[in-house]
From Swiss-Prot:
Residues 5-24 are annotated as: Disordered. Gene3D superfamilies: 2.40.50.90. The gene is LCL3. Residues 84-249 form the TNase-like domain. Its EC number is 3.1.-.-. This is Probable endonuclease LCL3. Residues 10-24 have a biased composition (Basic and acidic residues). It comes from Laccaria bicolor (strain S238N-H82 / ATCC MYA-4686) (Bicoloured deceiver). InterPro entries: SNase_OB-fold_sf, Staphylococal_nuclease_OB-fold. It is found in: Mitochondrion; Membrane. It holds the Pfam family SNase. The keyword Kinase does not apply. The keyword Ribonucleoprotein does not apply. The active site is at 134, 142, 182.
Length: 281
């Protein structure tokens, strides 16, 4: 006689098959039961904590990558203490060792493919919208101001910095605030080939020394790129003496070679620091 399975046997086999297909079913049911057993107040607290953590994360992310620093008052001591990096476009160069920067945060709408904002070009639109940046570690010839005459080569030094920076994107590591409320910073140009998100371009302070349009700043509060003061000294020395060496070795180019920048008439040229001391009284 052939045995035929009953309905109960079929249901039992079906249940066994379902359990075989979902080995985590018991664990899921256990977790669901535990969650359902939690008091409403505990669930509310957990939801609030999750929301608070999310809000803090979003706010921190926005402050770091999306909020624009409109002027120096937006830069807090904590921000300077971290020696944070920012990027922006130079909108004006009024002196040979400082300039105005329009901050363009990474997620602020100033960079493709998310570009939907433009940088103002009119002076009235830039009022109170820029950071006053001072180049770290260097000093350039003083322009005429407060009744004092201009230092020799002040105009040439200013022209060099304008040619180097004006209208260009730069990266600034913010160091401190000086006595004139300017932000002292290590300033770098954009790299020519490599991605700017991973690499920095040329250090503008070192380029100023190399061109011969400034000296090392050695007064109180001097700041140099980490571990590179010797490089500042070396580059300044090269700017002073390189042409003298060339002229001594290659007289044929004597008429074309000239000392660099402020060292044109020799290393005895008055430095910006000496100029300031002379007019301090």
């Amino acid at each position: 006689m052939v045995w035929l399975p009953g309905i109960n046997d079929l249901n039992r086999d079906k249940n066994n098959t379902n359990n075989d297909k979902d080995p985590n079913n018991d664990l899921f049911q256990d977790l669901k039961t535990r969650l359902d057993s939690l008091p409403t107040s505990a669930i509310a607290i957990a939801s609030f904590a999750t929301g608070a953590v999310t809000a803090v994360f979003i706010t921190t992310f926005h402050v770091r990558y999306g909020r624009r620093l409109k002027n120096g008052e937006w830069i807090t001591p904590d921000f300077l203490g971290r020696n944070s990096w920012i990027k922006g476009v130079v909108t004006s160069v009024g002196d040979a060792d400082n300039f105005r920067l329009y901050h363009t945060p990474a997620l602020g709408g100033y960079t493709w493919p998310f570009k939907f904002r433009t940088i103002p070009s009119l002076s009235k639109d830039l009022k109170d919208q820029t950071l006053h940046i001072r180049l770290a570690g260097v000093d350039a010839p003083e322009a005429a101001h407060f009744g004092k005459p201009a230092q020799p080569y002040a105009a040439e030094s200013l022209a060099w910095l304008r040619e180097t920076l004006l209208g260009k994107k730069v990266y600034c590591q913010l160091i401190r605030r000086d006595q004139y409320s300017r932000i002292v910073a290590h300033v770098h140009l954009r790299p020519r080939i490599l991605p700017s998100s991973l690499f920095r371009g040329r250090n503008v302070s070192l380029e100023l020394l190399k061109a011969g349009w400034g000296t090392i700043y050695e007064q109180a509060g001097a700041e140099y790129a980490k571990g590179r003061k010797d490089e500042y000294i070396r580059i300044e020395a090269e700017a002073k003496f390189v042409t003298k060496i060339i002229n001594s070795l290659l007289p044929i180019i004597l008429n074309r070679a000239a000392r660099r920048g402020i060292w044109k008439h020799g290393k005895s040229a008055e430095t910006p620091a000496e100029y300031k001391r002379r007019y301090a009284g």
